[in-house]
Amino acid sequence: MKEILNALYHQKDLNDEEVKKLFTLIIHEKVSPVQLGAILCALKIKGESFKEISVAATTLLEHAPKPFNSGLDLIDNCGTGGDGLKTINISTIAALIASSMGLSMAKHGSRSVSSHSGSADLLENLGVNIEMNPTQLENCFKQTHFGFLFAPLYHQSFKKSAPLRKELFTKTIFNCLGPLINPLRPKIQLLGVYDKSLCKTMALALKALGVKRAMVVNGGGTDEIVLHDITHACELKNNGILEYDLSAKDFDLPPYDLKELQIENAQESTQACLDILENKGKDSHTMVVVANVASLLYLSHKAKDLKEGVSMTLEHLKTKAPYAHLQKIIRLSHA
């Protein structure tokens, strides 16, 4: 531990063996709170490398139980959170709609830290059992193409270190790790990051973890694809990384103001979700979710481009099938 701390104090990247050792110790609670705080802050100041992030994620995954084997190329759109802008739950609503269109969505998430409502909070408020056992999860997934994996059930180190991390008043490597440690190991990911500078780093980490296709995005300071500003994207495709910017025009959608996406409480987010699924949501809410669903369709080769993905999603919403789909998820999650 002393050698690891000294390396970080001198702003040196840890090698694979050191990262694996460090996170194995963290998992087994062999690191004191003072040491953990020092490590997280030193990593933050140095800047976490994609290798440190990917090896840490691999170590955490090796110790996480896998609930079932799907035999499919699963998709996740979990983001880092931490943008502090308190918007509606764009990625969770997008995952519900995408799964109602047949995409195999294995949604990994937790409760809110910086927003009014995290993915787990929203789903729980909608009536979904967020702590499904493996049998319930597999059954729900097989019948709806949607499964929610509540992070604290699979990664105790996240749960136990949460109070300490909250007291640091800063984002740490744990924010980056959240979207990378889905126990079902999805091969396709739409991953939002709280800082544009992380896009390339996280795309490289996904590549190192064996993800086949991905898009890492930061839209106007949010960890989502947005329509009010430019979305910076790093796309993992054919084992290479493409870097580019997206605007509302790329989706053939009008721009909307960020303020229209912001909410005052969790109840507003829940109602916004229900309204969108019933195709009666505010245009500003619906269209930003549609842009994110379109990106999932594009990454999954279900749409040839983003504009086709938008058209497909808008047509699907007219059927109100996503709302009936949610009711089925709620029922099966408690079965």
Swiss-Prot record:
Subunit structure: Homodimer.
Native source species: Helicobacter pylori (strain ATCC 700392 / 26695) (Campylobacter pylori)
Matches recorded under InterPro entries: Anthranilate_Pribosyl_Tfrase, Glycosyl_Trfase_fam3, Glycosyl_Trfase_fam3_N_dom, Glycosyl_Trfase_fam3_N_dom_sf, Nuc_phospho_transferase
Entry EC no(s): 2.4.2.18
Binding-site residues, anthranilate 2: 165
Its biological purpose: Catalyzes the transfer of the phosphoribosyl group of 5-phosphorylribose-1-pyrophosphate (PRPP) to anthranilate to yield N-(5'-phosphoribosyl)-anthranilate (PRA).
Gene name per UniProt: trpD
Binding annotation for Mg(2+) 2: 223-224
Biological process terms in GO annotation: L-tryptophan biosynthetic process
List of residues binding Mg(2+) 1: 91, 224
Recorded metabolic or biological pathway in which this protein acts: Amino-acid biosynthesis; L-tryptophan biosynthesis; L-tryptophan from chorismate: step 2/5
Catalytic activity: N-(5-phospho-beta-D-ribosyl)anthranilate + diphosphate = 5-phospho-alpha-D-ribose 1-diphosphate + anthranilate
Annotated binding of 5-phospho-alpha-D-ribose 1-diphosphate, by residue: 79, 82-83, 87, 89-92, 107-115, 119
Disulfide bond sites: none
Endpoints of the signal sequence: none
SUPFAM superfamilies per UniProt: Nucleoside phosphorylase/phosphoribosyltransferase catalytic domain (SSF52418), Nucleoside phosphorylase/phosphoribosyltransferase N-terminal domain (SSF47648)
Binding of anthranilate 1, residues: 79
Family: Belongs to the anthranilate phosphoribosyltransferase family.
Keyword tags: Amino-acid biosynthesis, Aromatic amino acid biosynthesis, Glycosyltransferase, Magnesium, Metal-binding, Transferase, Tryptophan biosynthesis
Example of a GO MF term: magnesium ion binding
Note describing how the cofactor binds: Binds 2 magnesium ions per monomer.
The protein's name: Anthranilate phosphoribosyltransferase
Domain of life the protein comes from: Bacteria
Gene Ontology CC: cytosol
Cofactor(s) this protein requires: Mg(2+)
